[in-house]
Amino acid sequence: MEYNKQMYETLVAIRATAQKLNKELESLTNDFKRIHAINKELKQKKQLLEVFELYDKLVVSGLEAEKIINDNAMKEFHELAILDLDAAKEQIPDLEEKLKVLLLPADPNDDKEVIVEMRPAAGGDESSIFVGNMFDLYKEYCSKHNWKINVIEMLPTSVGYSFISFEINGEDVYSKMKFESGVHRVQRVPATEAKGRVHTSTITIAVLPQQDDVEIEINPADLRIDTYRASGAGGQHVNRTESAVRITHIPTGIVAACQEGKSQIANRETAMKMLRSKLWEAAEKEKNDALSALRKNQVGSGDRAEKIRTYNYPQNRVTDHRINMSLNSLDRFMMGEIDEMIDALRSKEQEEKMKLIMNE
């Protein structure tokens, strides 16, 4: 029976490593950094090992069936063995393809929750309005995935928003939302346009994986923390108390602020989350700037300046330029039905990883 022996041996070794990690985890009590690292590694390997368990059973079953078929002393079992062998041969190729994908290097941030920042770019009022439209899209998308949105900062204008930041909490959020980083272009006729001309405007979206304090260490001495009165809707409470918090990381000049929480403590916690994510982003940018152009051209590079998508309202079409994919269902897309596009982007990302491995 044919099967990928090299891959099988690799997976046996991965399973053995996971078993060792589980044993180590049982003996750990106070080393929280190590506990965190082990749990993260085991979570990343969970799906791979689940598929391998089925694959392993089929390989063992197929090999045993072959032995029975080749043993004339066991002729009475040949018919059953042939059925087992045929079942193994039928399922093994598909499982091997799944395992090849699962063996690709995982993005270490895929299982993380995220912080999203949205800003108008070119296009004046239309750009500000589209920031609000995209926020509504993400609210619907999060609802479909049972993710929770928590607004960090929301700065309204007369027609839209000059800035919105929010966190998304749930399972494997970054693995899907990371593809939303970049410049989003909208083409439509503004409500104020008397001659019916189509205007083009853009907004920028940044998606940052939330970083644990275990992963991003910050020296408290490097921080300046300011409090101020929150602006915007909120009644008398907004005007009386300095609940908004702004944290500046002095060595880098990076600033994170939050004013939407119910208390100064809650806003400070959220601002620290944002700061950790922004420091991670700055470190990643520095690292990636040193890499070849190959990585920069990859899907999901997260470059804020990359024009990734066009929303054409007159033609009810949305186009993702990274994969040259168009959907003639912009109306449904704007209601949060974006998984078809996201799944295509994830598949492209996996293809690129596979190509890199093949070329090494």
Curated annotation (Swiss-Prot):
The modification N5-methylglutamine is found at Q236. GO terms for molecular function: translation release factor activity, codon specific. PROSITE patterns: RF_PROK_I. Keywords: Cytoplasm, Methylation, Protein biosynthesis. One of its GO terms (cellular component) is cytoplasm. SUPFAM superfamilies: Release factor (SSF75620). Methylated by PrmC. Methylation increases the termination efficiency of RF1. It comes from the Bacteria. Pfam families: PCRF, RF-1. Transmembrane segments: none annotated. PANTHER family: LD18447P. Belongs to the prokaryotic/mitochondrial release factor family. Peptide chain release factor 1 directs the termination of translation in response to the peptide chain termination codons UAG and UAA. This is Peptide chain release factor 1. It comes from Mycoplasmoides gallisepticum (strain R(low / passage 15 / clone 2)) (Mycoplasma gallisepticum). The lineage of its organism: Bacteria, Bacillati, Mycoplasmatota, Mycoplasmoidales, Mycoplasmoidaceae.
